[in-house]
From Swiss-Prot:
Region (G5): 318-320
Region named G2: 143-147
Alphabetical list of HAMAP family matching this protein: GTPase_Era
Species whose genome carries this gene: Danio rerio
Transit peptide: 1-18
Pfam family of the protein (one): MMR_HSR1
Phylogenetic classification of the source organism: Eukaryota, Metazoa, Chordata, Craniata, Vertebrata
One Gene Ontology term, aspect cellular component: mitochondrial matrix
Family of the protein in this entry: Belongs to the TRAFAC class TrmE-Era-EngA-EngB-Septin-like GTPase superfamily. Era GTPase family.
Region ranges (G4): 233-236
Record region (G3): 164-167
Full protein name: GTPase Era, mitochondrial
Topology of this chain in the membrane: Peripheral membrane protein
Annotated stretches, region: G1: 117-124
rRNA-binding is among the record's keywords: yes
């Protein structure tokens, strides 16, 4: 199916084989979804008798789409991953596991997925949901993820490698905010390695939801041979659900999987893709036009006039409160996996060291609790990392701040804030390492 709204929308609808020719009576047209694969979906509670036909284009009926989207019940089960894998708190053991030869099954399949998008689109949250546990730091502030990290999801004979990338930003912003070079280069490197690209868009952000950034389009254009899917995130936070139809049309430029989509009820016309620019980009292999990014900046500039990408293979819509939507995307990834040797042993959950996991977890709490630039200026240092005689992992972290005012902010009145940060970070680390953790965070002014 070319447009995959989400499992929540379709789970109570009838589904027919693509070999059937289906249609419904014209007076019930608002009750079903027509897609390019040649099947129709309608609500059996309302329509009892129908005739059928095939339709060559993807048409989304606004009535049934909004009805199912608004009535979908929230699912709170977080068990998306069946394996209770943990990250080893011992650096040597974690490194040894990463170096261990994969335990290849007989019919091994694999898929490497790069998750890209603008800062704060929800990339790390989605990665955590797919893995079935919280592993990567998330916060409401931008640039929570500072460098690429790998999450590994292994089930039966299939391994999905998730590349969680920093939010795409510009060189000007990186220089202005003194951001690490990894925020600029890691997303592009990830796409070169990927078998599939997931472009994540936060539809609750009215400033960015209707247009893909130049950086996202540039990533896609430089890797036209890598299949890409569009994921609209946080759809439950969008009050006017009818806007989802317009957003889909704008971000795909009216094309999904090589076919035009028609959306009933869309209030804005879909801008046609600039054929010249896209054809030049697709001729990359023949002309070698994009092998050297610097030499072909003029062609990439043509992307600035675009708001969408007409080469998405599929479209998903995710709710932050309904995990069935994530489960649908997860199943899609497993189906898309190809016969290929595994890259990691089945016990590997991430390529991060336990120290990096700890630093990122604490940093998440600092970002959540401190204002403006304060958490971005802090550095961490490990003082103690050892297992005590009672089997508890003792971790002592020294937090360095640049100003005395920042120190007062971190400590909080009566030490309440640093105590809360310590407790929350410690609880998260216990869930990641699957062992008791005794965390101690102290604050010091860097001179």
């Amino acid at each position: 199916m070319t447009l995959r709204s989400c499992e929540t929308f379709l789970r109570r609808s009838l589904r027919f084989s693509t070999a059937l020719n289906l249609t419904a009576f014209p007076e019930h047209e608002q009750l079903y979804l027509r897609v390019s694969s040649g099947c129709s979906v309608f609500r059996p509670q309302t329509v009892r008798k129908c005739l059928f036909h095939w339709t060559p284009a993807c048409t989304v009926s606004q009535g049934v789409f909004l009805d199912r989207l608004q009535k979908g019940a929230a699912v709170t089960d977080e068990s998306l991953c069946n394996q209770p894998v943990s990250v080893s708190p011992d650096r040597a053991q974690q490194f040894s596991l990463l170096m261990k030869d994969p335990d290849q099954p007989e019919n091994a399949k694999s898929l490497k997925v790069a998750i890209v998008g603008s800062p704060n689109a929800g990339k790390s949250t989605l990665t955590n949901q797919l893995l079935g546990r919280k592993l990567f730091a998330v916060s409401s502030k931008v640039h929570t993820t500072r460098s690429r990290a790998v999450g590994v999801l292994t089930e039966n004979d299939t391994q999905i490698v998730l590349l969680d990338t920093p939010g795409l930003t510009t060189q000007i912003k990186a220089k202005r905010h003194q951001l690490e070079n990894s925020l600029l280069v890691d997303p592009f490197k990830s796409l070169k390695e990927a078998d599939l690209v997931v472009v994540l868009v936060d539809v609750s952000d009215k400033w960015t939801r209707s247009k893909l950034s130049y950086e996202v389009l540039k990533c896609l254009a430089l890797n036209p041979d890598v299949p890409a899917v569009l994921v609209l995130n946080k759809v439950d936070l969008l009050k006017n659900k009818a806007l989802l139809l317009d957003i889909t049309a704008q971000l795909t430029e009216g094309m999904v999987n090589g076919k035009k989509i028609r959306i009933h009820g869309a209030s804005k016309p879909v801008r046609k893709a600039a054929a010249g620019a896209n054809s030049r980009l697709k001729e990359k292999k023949a002309a070698g036009s994009l092998e050297d990014e610097a030499d072909h900046e003029d062609k990439l500039k043509a992307l600035k006039s675009h708001g969408g990408w007409p080469h998405f293979k599929d479209v998903f819509m995710l709710s932050s409160i309904d995990h069935e939507d994530v489960e649908t995307l997860k199943r899609y990834l497993f189906v898309a996996a190809k016969p290929c040797q595994w890259q990691y042993h089945s016990e590997v959950l991430t390529d991060q060291s336990p120290e990096d996991v700890c630093f990122n977890t604490i940093r998440e709490k600092l970002l959540q609790n401190l204002p403006k630039e304060v958490p971005y200026t802090m550095t961490q240092e490990i003082e103690v990392w050892k297992e005590s005689e009672d089997g508890v992992l003792d971790i002592s972290i020294k937090l360095y701040v640049q100003k005395e005012t920042h120190m007062k902010m971190v400590i909080g009145p009566g030490g309440q804030l640093i105590t809360r940060i310590n407790q929350e970070a410690g609880n998260d680390l216990m869930k990641i390492f699957l062992c008791n953790v005794r965390l101690k965070i102290s604050v010091k002014l860097r001179k």
